[in-house]
Amino acid sequence: MYVTVEPGVTWLELYETLKPLGLRTPFWGPFSGKVSTVGGSMSFHALSHGTNNAVSADSLLSLQVVLGNGDVIETGSQGKGSQTSRFFRYYGPDIGGFFLGDSGALGIKTRISLKLKKYPEGFAACSFGFPDFEHLFQAMRDVAKLGVVSDNHGLDPRKQKTAIMEMENTNP
């Protein structure tokens, strides 16, 4: 299953369209929120909020791109001459990767096809504390192995505090 969108579609618009159908994309959207566009996420190789499906490119099946000379190309299994549907990104050499994280410098994305998966039957959030990073990492690894969690976050308060102090010292 896949969905094809124009690059100006926001993650919120896509979410609201797909949810009534019981579907979603593996990548939920970047840190900048639901108002971010799908095209922007691909152009800046956006990261999401957790450990699974955390990179926008992981949901990509194909791109339609207009090159600087005006040529229009299709990547993935929908590439030129292919009579197949958009089912697989890595059809031959993955030239789609050239246009991920390029900030639009290598071409203008005009159509983006993304994988779809079933929307989860349930949703819950919880928070835990750990005595140190090693225990946090072990717990995250064990949960990820179960395959039942879509996102798994972890923060080390000491590292966060250090990062904030460094930012304050370099940006007074």
Question: Residues of each region from the PLM?
Answer:
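C-terminal substrate-recognition/cap domain of FAD-linked oxidoreductases
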Residues: F128-D132, F137-P172
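Glycine-rich N-terminal segment of FAD-binding domains in flavoprotein oxidoreductases
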Residues: M1
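FAD-binding subdomain of flavoenzyme oxidoreductases
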Residues: T4-P7, W11-K145
